[in-house]
Amino acid sequence: MIRVLLADDQQLIREALAALLGLEVDLQIVGQVGSGDEVLGAVALLKPDVVLLDVQMPGTLLADGIEAAAALRDAGAVSESGEPVRTLIVTTFGRPGYVRRALEAGASGFVVKDTGARQLAEAIRRVHAGLRVV
């Protein structure tokens, strides 16, 4: 079972992602947060395998999902199984500059929000397996 934390400032998006991904037999949504500042604490508490991060989220310590990915990498965050926590950026902004920043911050993948549910689930599986998704 792949343990997933959702981080998006829009509650409707978080709940829709949780509902869709919850239909996958090998994915478990372990938590949801609405700001970059909540990500580190939630990861420390819930120890997910993969964190889905929106790029633009409110926060004072962590200004966006890309900064949250870098903070998780720098903190050496680990999952319940002891493996490094992987991050997947999920955003409406598919511009090359965002992709480059995300990968430089240690994100394992980058997908746009108009990706289908099956493709997103597969991206989570690939990121969990240590592969890069762009």
Task: Give the positions of each predicted feature.
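Conserved acidic segment of CheY-like receiver
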Residues: 1-13, 17-21
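Conserved active-site segment of CheY-like receiver
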Residues: 9, 90-94, 114-115
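Acidic, metal-coordinating helix/loop segments flanking the phosphotransfer/catalytic sites
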Residues: 32-50
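Short amphipathic alpha-helix used as the core "switch/output" element in two-component signaling
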Residues: 41, 63-83
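Active-site residues of response regulator receiver
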Residues: 54-55, 91
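Alpha4-beta5-alpha5 switch/output surface of CheY-like receiver
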Residues: 64, 95-98
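C-terminal output helix
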Residues: 97, 115-128, 132
